[in-house]
Amino acid sequence: MSEQKQDVAATEQQPVLQIQRIYVKDVSFEAPNLPHIFQQEWKPKLGFDLSTETTQVGDDLYEVVLNISVETTLEDSGDVAFICEVKQAGVFTISGLEDVQMAHCLTSQCPNMLFPYARELVSNLVNRGTFPALNLSPVNFDALFVEYMNRQQAENAEEKSEEEQTKH
């Protein structure tokens, strides 16, 4: 009997990360200079921006939104070829994680699961605009998380240093 209680307690302590739903929250594709842009030499300059948003939507339920914005201009003329914006989202059940683990899960693991969907959507939108194929390179969300944590630690150390200087 006590083994069953221990098994139940151990099960309750296990970290949980489950996908509940993956969906497109928002999408936009603009090609303001069509059709004359196709008469120019195709030397694209790609601008890429990536961010995430997280919202707790219930007990152990989190919505994570991966925002991708791609703006392509032509090098010679500076004309905008296209602007593609995608908000790929998912609802995840997450429990049994400490603060840093939870932050890593929400800002690295969940976006990593969403990225292939967003990359495919961007590729399809660009293709439907009849532009040359655009395949976004994989993103190392773990490295971005480490970079974020290092920035946070540096900012915290800087704040402590400033507080100590004002005390003296």
UniProtKB/Swiss-Prot annotation:
InterPro entries: SecB, SecB-like_sf. GO terms for molecular function: unfolded protein binding. The keyword Chaperone applies. GO terms for biological process: protein folding; protein tetramerization; protein transport. It is found in: Cytoplasm. It comes from the Bacteria. The keyword Chaperone applies. This is Protein-export protein SecB. Gene3D superfamilies: SecB-like (3.10.420.10). Homotetramer, a dimer of dimers. One homotetramer interacts with 1 SecA dimer. It comes from Haemophilus influenzae (strain PittGG). Its main location: cytoplasm. GO terms for cellular component: cytoplasm. The gene is secB. Keywords: Chaperone, Cytoplasm, Protein transport, Translocation, Transport. One of the proteins required for the normal export of preproteins out of the cell cytoplasm. It is a molecular chaperone that binds to a subset of precursor proteins, maintaining them in a translocation-competent state. It also specifically binds to its receptor SecA. Belongs to the SecB family.
